[in-house]
A protein has these predicted regions:
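Helix-start (N-cap) detector for alpha-helical repeat units in TPR-like alpha-solenoids
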Residues: 7, 41-42, 75-76, 106-110, ...
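Alpha-helical segment of the N-proximal tetratricopeptide repeat
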Residues: 6-36, 46-53, 87, 115, ...
């Protein structure tokens, strides 16, 4: 160990190199610090972040794991690694390291656990983790974000009254967040409260007009309300914004077109839906109905 250059001075020098964009020089200094001070996590964090910038995630994870192998009780490094894995969409590994932490000691770890389970679509475990988090942490900026994820989870579990309850709690802070308004729209739609649903969908669109998903739900809601022209417009906007619209959305668009007597358009959209999904029964029936209308076999749908 070089006692003429104490840790803090050498760490500051490395960070200065990094701030100047001299990442290779900084990396070399950080790695020397790790060799000389393997018990100090600061250089480990900095190397992991430099590796992340270079896309070298595996090396960063291995480095942080090596620290924990020597100091498995270090909660700060474990939490850092959990967040690092989370940030890089490595959900299973994040869970492995975050589960080690006691919720009462590191409540935020339970939030990250819930988020990881949510991303893995393990909704029951996600729900348990997030409920645990909000029971422990009564005063935190993450509380209302946890409510948003709980609302999403309850939608996936088809428990719409519970979803509405969590959405209303999140609304205290996030009333102008487009996604929360979309959550309200989806929840109200599934509860049959279409007048409420349409207001939420329209607000979500106003807040984020370039986000596709509110247009899809607006289309569904307008269709239920019998406003077929707005349903058609919404579905078309959704298709415009998304690269790979599925068969269901083309089927819904075609059905809206039938309602406003755009039978040729409807037939074209039904054919697109069938091409995307050859087993789509609604598209098959729709093609037959549209063809019959165009041939005069049956009257236009009212």
């Amino acid at each position: 160990m070089d006692h003429n250059h104490p840790f803090e001075f050498r760490l500051k020098t490395a960070r200065n190199y990094e701030s100047e964009g001299k990442n290779l020089h900084a990396l070399q200094l950080y790695l020397r610090l790790i060799d000389d001070y393997p018990e100090s996590p600061e250089a480990f964090y900095s190397v992991a972040e430099l590796y992340e910038k270079a896309g070298n995630i595996d090396s960063a994870v291995s480095l942080l794991k090596s620290f924990l192998n020597n100091d498995p009780e270090n909660k700060d490094v474990r939490l850092f690694l959990g967040q690092y894995l989370l940030r890089n969409s490595r959900w299973e590994e994040a869970i492995e390291f975050l589960e080690y932490l006691m919720p009462e000691e590191e409540p935020v770890a339970v939030f990250f656990l819930g988020y990881s389970y949510f991303m893995l679509k393990d909704y029951e475990r996600a729900r348990v983790s997030l409920l645990n988090f909000i029971n422990i942490e009564k005063q935190t900026e993450l509380l209302h974000e946890a409510h948003i994820y709980l609302a999403k989870i309850e939608i996936q579990l088809k428990r719409y009254e519970a979803a509405l309850s969590y959405a209303q709690k999140a609304n205290v802070i996030y009333s102008n967040f487009w996604e929360l308004n979309l959550i309200f729209a989806i929840t109200y739609y599934n509860l049959g409260m279409f007048a409420h649903a349409v207001m939420s969908a329209e607000k979500a669109i106003r807040l984020n007009p370039q986000e596709p998903s509110p247009y899809e739900w607006a289309g569904k809601i307008y269709y239920k309300l019998g406003d077929y022209e707005k349903a058609e417009t919404s579905f078309l906007k959704y298709i415009e914004l998304i690269e790979d619209a599925g068969a269901d959305i083309y089927t819904s668009l075609a059905q809206a077109c039938l309602k406003v007597k755009k039978t040729k358009d409807a037939l074209a959209y039904f054919n697109v839906a069938l091409k995307l999904d050859p087993e789509n029964k609604s598209a098959i029936e729709g093609i037959q109905n549209a063809s019959d209308i165009l041939s005069g076999t049956v009257p236009d749908i009212q």
